[in-house]
């Protein structure tokens, strides 16, 4: 989840969460423009990968764009979408911390329904809370699904992209440490190097981040200084996304609605900016399309202080991939193109 942190840990974004009715959650939204006839570009089978998407989808307004881009990416064999919790910030926002994962689950259902897919991906409940400590899993459908897929006799590379806290992947690892050499973690999160500090996705489960960083699992980290560069404007989204099917209209409308609400809620803060947004989750998709081999460094792993969230040295031979650049236009234009191809404007 892209988080433009405005003034440190005390200032944070707030998502407007309106629970869906049972009818809204279960009704398939048919549209005259559908993805059922979508003919994606050909991708050699040997280049395809297996993928789980872990997302705090109702936290604000950008996860939805990354979900749609990933689903429309022919390189990806999507094995499931996992709704992740954001209970720590829900508590600070005086919201029901028990409900963050469920709200996200309903949002994923809505997005997938509006896409009108011939074969929708599986959707899994994630953990309702952050893990209690670095040794105890929060067992969930999502964590168990990751383990089951990872332990299959399948040589196709398996990735888990975490657009929010990394709770469910950490829980999967704690349930079955053998998955460490079978899964690559791609995480949108963590503060800027070298110091680090408070960052939204990290704040929602620092213990989970430490579990994965300390493990033998390969990690690709896209920290805040990089993911925040995925800038677009509401005008560009209106022009390139809104005309394309019910899903395009929804992506635009839900962002406008959240922008209006958050701007009125926090009139003295410099977020939202009013006419622009950073689609900070989408790099999790684009680095799997193209690794940006000159945009990262393999560096010694650090872990996170549980109180101030700064980076701490960790005695280990492990190195992780840390991105210092992801191409914003490649990332965004790929999404725009796929939406336009799948849902031609009338």
Give residue ranges: language-model regions.
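Bacterial N-terminal signal peptides that target proteins for export
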Residues: 1-8
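Bacterial N-terminal signal peptides
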Residues: 9-17
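N-terminal acidic, glycine/proline-rich low-complexity segments
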Residues: 23-346
